[in-house]
Amino acid sequence: MQPQVILQIDSSAESHRELIERLVSESMGKVDAYLRKYDEKPDAVVRIEVTIKKNSDDSFHGKLHANLDGELILFEREKFFKLDDLIHHAFQHMKEQLAAK
């Protein structure tokens, strides 16, 4: 099972695309161990969608929607001025939700 990761980067944040892609890739590595349980299900669908938008005050708005074989994990935050903090918080939230199961 290979997780499907979808990045939706608003035109307002397009100039940060490389950084967003790198941060999401790094963060996926941190939740990889928690996603391994879905390897046992060959028909499992693991889809993680990350949406990033830059606000007019130079802060960022981000969403993480994960569908892990029917289990939903949702995270949304506004007003993060550091893009890395926003993405790391989103994946930390997902990791905590997975660890609790």
Positions of predicted regions on the chain:
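N-terminal, polar/charged subdomain of small-to-medium soluble alpha/beta proteins
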Residues: 1-101
